[in-house]
């Protein structure tokens, strides 16, 4: 794994762990953070990340194992994350968006990795693809 790839994952994890404290809060409704403090709506410990990072790690793991993009392998890892807490900072899936849940349920029913819905937070979950390919 390249240093750039590893660095992108560390950056995502740090940003996600920092941001979880303020998750679901509107701008201007909180005092800006100057340190990582944990807490937030999920009561996470300092340094723990959310489902967004868990999914990014699933994608990174799939890209490395498959030596490129494999939609079925990727979504199977997302299902493991959702059902078993795979790559979760807590060992369980404590949050998942409705669009993601719907896509995973569709996949379990159809076995078609492209049968899901569109998640508006997708961009934050695919940063590993261009870095992996570079």
Provide a role label for each language-model segment.
Residues 1-134:
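Structured, active/binding-site neighborhoods that engage oxygen-rich ligands
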């Amino acid at each position: 794994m390249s240093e750039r790839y590893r660095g992108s994952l560390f950056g995502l994890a740090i940003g996600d762990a920092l941001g979880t404290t303020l998750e679901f809060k509107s701008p201007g409704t909180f005092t800006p953070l100057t340190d990582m403090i944990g807490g937030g709506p999920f009561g996470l410990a300092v340094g723990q990340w959310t489902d967004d990072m868990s999914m990014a790690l699933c994608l990174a793991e799939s890209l490395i194992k498959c030596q490129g993009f494999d939609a079925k392998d990727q979504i199977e890892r997302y299902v493991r994350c959702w059902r078993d807490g795979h790559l979760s900072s807590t060992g369980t899936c404590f949050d998942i968006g409705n669009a993601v849940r719907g896509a995973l349920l569709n996949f379990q029913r159809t076995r078609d990795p492209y049968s899901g819905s569109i998640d508006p937070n997708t961009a934050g979950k695919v940063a590993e693809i261009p870095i992996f390919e570079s």
